[in-house]
């Protein structure tokens, strides 16, 4: 009893490895209707359990994290699922072992060949592993996963990097570094000359021409977080350096030098542009479907000299493929995420086109850029100094003139229209007199006919005396009462609309010159801004509907991916 009490004083763990066992490969059972069937493919065990000789692993689950997948339970009901015999010493006597629900292999954690779960409250407290539950736990017992780890576990490079990083306290993933597959030596590597002159494809080098120097934007935008679920770069400025012309060439791309371009993604989804396709050699490239399939680019986003090309997104090809097909001789490229394999370009070269002297084109490009930089260097320095002297925060966008001395919420006051123009204001809102007769708007923007709101004078009534004309000094006093307020670009649109509505009748126009922004249809821009003020609630509602539809489609695609049958490799008869 002393040992048991001493064990309870230790900090509780969530994963426990308890026993060694074996299983027949043909041992299967039918999945019956169940109330708890979670998706555990993303459940990763500590690294020590993948190397230990003990193969049975028990893990405590949390119902609010590992939730019941109702659709998967309905779909897999009646399917054959792998099972194994639980050792008699695993649980105490009279434990309801028959209530375990063995899971389909697609829902098991990585590296497990069989496993099942005890639902919430199925196991009594005396049968629950002591090390997996706190002595102060109250209520029903949490669900428990019992799995049989495979004899040989092959984890992906991303999982290995994740486990190694958390094993070492000082492990930090650098932001940029070369592809890890090129930093090690592997046996049976192809010689460089064999790799460069192989008959199936040509290994090329992707060279991105440097962009022109440009002024920094006065409106700083937050950095967009990296995402690898889609990757469609613009390769029109990329030169493919090939040792010799061949029908198909491949090249490693860089997520830093060749970032994802949303405009390319929209072009591939639409029907307006043609995306030429070609058949990839089955003996070279694996069959990738779903989110890992290659994306074929439109013609205007292809490199020079190619009839068609496609891009594999980061992480879609395995590290083993890179080792066997490219090996140590792939050109290292900078990547934002080093824990997954880099993106790959596959292009079909134009056979009838004349060869391009890439080195000469690069030299000409650099000479042209050097001349442009020399001409604009002085102007660039002056503009940069001017931008640095300004406040780094986002400045004005719309200036409003009203009689109220108080500044509206979300705005700041200025002294004159010149100051508003210097802050970047391009539009203005002014208050109109109620006697003017123009079109009426619901939100008060633009002028409106207010004479109908006043009662008509009776015929017998005497006309009111006309007000005496104001003197010049009185007119100046009235003009001094005008208050100018500026709203920023990122100001709340509801605050802007509320401030305009309080003015009653307002007119929206451009500030300053007749055509302050050359090349822009200012009238159309004002109409669009007015429409945004009017229908902002409808726009938000439509966006909410689109986001809900997107979430539903993603959940449906995930379930369809889980229901795909497991394919076997025709060469080795193993699961791919």
Curated annotation (Swiss-Prot):
Presence of the UniProt keyword Repeat in the record: yes
Xref: InterPro entries: DM7
Keywords: Repeat
Annotated segments matching region Disordered: 454-481
Biased composition (Acidic residues): 457-478
Keyword Repeat on entry: yes
Domain of life: Eukaryota
Range of residues in the leader sequence: none
Family: Belongs to the DM7 family.
Protein name listed in UniProt: DM7 family protein GD16138
Taxonomic lineage of the native organism: Eukaryota, Metazoa, Ecdysozoa, Arthropoda, Hexapoda
